[in-house]
């Protein structure tokens, strides 16, 4: 079995699932479209941290990440 580690080079593979769930929560809570929710998430400081492997935020689930996003706003 190969040692499978999350690195900066493969982190992009797990981000869409987390971000899409965050976007659904955001859209429902703020009454915006999914596209608008995605735009706000991708432009947030939370996402900038999430996309850096060394922040280790990728360990968090979408609910915890969403709560971090709300604290930022």
Where are these regions (language model features)?
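C-terminal alpha-helical interaction appendages
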Residues: 1-73
């Amino acid at each position: 079995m190969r040692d499978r580690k999350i690195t900066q080079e493969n982190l992009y593979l797990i981000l869409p699932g987390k971000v899409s769930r965050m976007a659904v929560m955001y859209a429902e809570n703020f009454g915006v479209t999914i596209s608008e929710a995605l735009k706000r998430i991708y432009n947030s400081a939370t996402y900038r941290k999430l996309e850096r492997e060394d922040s280790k935020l990728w360990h968090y689930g979408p609910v915890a990440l969403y709560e971090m996003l709300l604290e930022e706003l």
